[in-house]
């Protein structure tokens, strides 16, 4: 008798899990609340453009993973060398290369450059990092206070919504490379994007699943899980109640906080969401030459990152037109999440003019998308709850949360 899996969610994790289980002889059903698969990596067409939930790059230094990607998706991946910059300054006219390099540091004003070099020598102390009690202390011990204040203070707060001294040290980057030269963001790694948006890769996986006998149930939201003696007995959706037999395994790819709540375990685990505003422009290109995305840590503009998707793949926008994605992080229930979509779009357009990227007369259309569960937030005082909730879920014999 074939073993059977019921997978909740059809994002990358759910799709790849289904694909590989089917290849091993399992029967697989997938339940998805949206009308299409792909989760946070889905793509869709709108007004002649291909939109992503957010720009995604397939990158890895692992040769086996590169081989796997090229074997299965080579014809729908566009390899590239991708560059980005931090845009700062009162007039948004200061451009800083990222990741850091000695070449870029040498372009700094002499006094600032010397100060940073001294701090890099003084603070290069593993013992200080081990003693760090929060993100701020850890980054200080890694690169010194000057670079931290320039690049790792305002931006993390804008992304996560909390001060860096309230964030745990493990949020901090484990290491910050100082390269000799200004090089692509993903140096010495395979890097590519989906030719027709990230979703085209996951659409292919979906087709592989169908060809192997997997079944999809779209537009169906899981609203509860019933259990008895540490086994899941039923999956309840907005359409149906599914009985789980002894030979069936439930695999949840939903956020761990949601999986716990479906089992009746309330919790305070939080996520940061991403609102993406799409700007369709009657221009060939917008960002500076060879720049694919830019970061903004300023409180005076709504967005934290702007990506020109057509620079990643020319196939996502019509000829002589381009597409910008403005990303804004938020939390469910905060002031931003209560704004009307039109007001958000209008503010993004004003801010794009402010940073001198887009004039309104170039804009031929806009759209907006919300993803409320993107980045798991871990306040220092909630770290124990994360372990507690994961342990609670692991107690169920026929349930896996991945």
For the regions a language model picked out, list residue spans one by one.
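N-terminal Rossmann-like FAD-binding beta1-loop-alpha1 element of flavoenzymes
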Residues: 3-30
């Amino acid at each position: 008798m074939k073993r059977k899996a019921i997978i909740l969610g059809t994002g990358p994790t759910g799709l790849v899990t289904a694909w590989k289980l089917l290849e091993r002889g399992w029967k697989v059903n997938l339940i998805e609340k949206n009308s299409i698969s792909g989760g946070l990596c889905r793509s869709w067409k709108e007004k002649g453009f291909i939109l992503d939930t957010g720009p995604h790059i397939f990158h890895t230094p692992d040769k086996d993973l590169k081989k796997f990607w090229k074997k299965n998706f080579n014809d729908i991946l566009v390899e590239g060398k991708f560059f980005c910059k931090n845009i700062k300054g009162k007039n948004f006219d200061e451009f800083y290369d990222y990741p850091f390099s000695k070449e870029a540091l040498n372009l700094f004003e002499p006094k600032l450059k010397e100060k940073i070099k001294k701090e890099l020598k003084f603070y290069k102390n593993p013992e200080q990092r081990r003693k760090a009690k929060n993100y701020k202390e850890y980054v200080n011990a890694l690169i010194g206070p000057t670079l931290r204040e320039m690049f790792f203070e305002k931006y993390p707060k804008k992304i996560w919504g909390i001060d860096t001294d309230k964030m745990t040290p493990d949020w901090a980057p484990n290491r910050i490379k100082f390269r000799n030269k200004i090089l692509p963001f993903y140096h010495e790694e395979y890097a590519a994007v989906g030719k027709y948006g990230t979703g085209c890769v996951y659409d292919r996986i979906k087709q592989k699943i169908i060809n192997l006998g997997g079944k999809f149930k779209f537009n169906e939201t899981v609203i509860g899980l019933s259990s008895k003696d540490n086994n899941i007995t039923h999956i309840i959706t907005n359409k149906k109640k599914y009985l789980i037999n002894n030979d069936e395994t439930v695999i949840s790819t939903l956020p761990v906080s949601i999986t716990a709540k479906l089992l009746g375990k309330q919790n305070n685990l939080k996520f940061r969401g991403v609102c993406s505003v799409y700007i369709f422009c009657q221009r060939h290109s917008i960002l500076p030459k060879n720049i694919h995305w830019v970061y903004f840590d300023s409180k005076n503009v709504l967005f934290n990152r702007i990506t020109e998707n057509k620079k990643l793949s020319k196939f996502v926008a019509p000829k002589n037109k381009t597409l910008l994605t403005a990303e804004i992080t938020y939390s469910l229930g905060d002031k931003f999440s209560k704004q009307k979509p039109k007001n958000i779009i209008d503010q993004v357009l004003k801010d794009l003019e402010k940073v001198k990227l887009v004039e309104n007369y170039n804009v031929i259309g806009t759209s907006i998308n919300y993803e409320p569960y993107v980045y798991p937030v871990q306040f220092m005082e909630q770290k124990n709850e994360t372990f507690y909730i994961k342990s609670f879920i692991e107690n169920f014999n026929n349930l896996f949360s991945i």
